[in-house]
Amino acid sequence: DVSTSMLAEDLKPNRLEAAKDVAAEFINGRPNDNIGITLFAGETFTQCPLTVDHAVLLDMIHNIKCGLIEDGTAVGMGIANAVTRLKDSKAKSKVIILLTDGTNNKGDISPLTAAEIAKSFGIRVYTIGVGTNGMAPYPYPVGNTVQYVNMPVEIDEKTLTQIAGTTDGNYFRATSNSK
């Protein structure tokens, strides 16, 4: 998820950087696996197709930033794009790790429909809700400075749990950098 809400600073330095750390840690723990990167906000694209060149993956993760694509949260489209990349893989285990801080509000495919599609190809989806509970400080540019506005944290845990359940994955909640 590269929507601008990932810039909220309830995780340090912000949600996006915390999610990138999780992704890098995952890649480093799977040295022989084919791994790819699909980004989404209001739309989705494949940043890196499946590869075992983890140095390239880590470099690409390092360069991920918000604002690369239209803003919003198209969870279903992100899953569908990842499924397109994984569906023909001969790997015995096909997994999508979905990191998001929001509620689906864009895209032509609902998250639950995308989960059903993933399931039909034997792909498990592990979902991770990124962010604290309550309110989170969000940077808001004002001229040459940045002010912070407390915004409500709106993670659709029900849908993320349903996505994981439909695909035999699991849902996790990351409320701090250590969890």
Language model: regions and residue ranges:
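Short glycine-enriched loops at secondary-structure junctions
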Residues: 41-45, 131-132, 178
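Hydrophobic/aromatic beta-strand patches that form the interior of the parallel beta-sheet core
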Residues: 38, 97, 126-128, 172
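Conserved acidic
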Residues: 1, 101
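Membrane-embedded segments
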Residues: 2-94, 109
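Juxtamembrane amphipathic/hinge helix adjacent to a transmembrane helix
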Residues: 170-179
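VWA/integrin I-like adhesion module and closely mimicked acidic/polar interface patches used
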Residues: 70, 84, 95, 102-166
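Short, conserved active-site loop motifs that form the nucleotide-linked donor/cofactor pocket
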Residues: 35, 123, 169
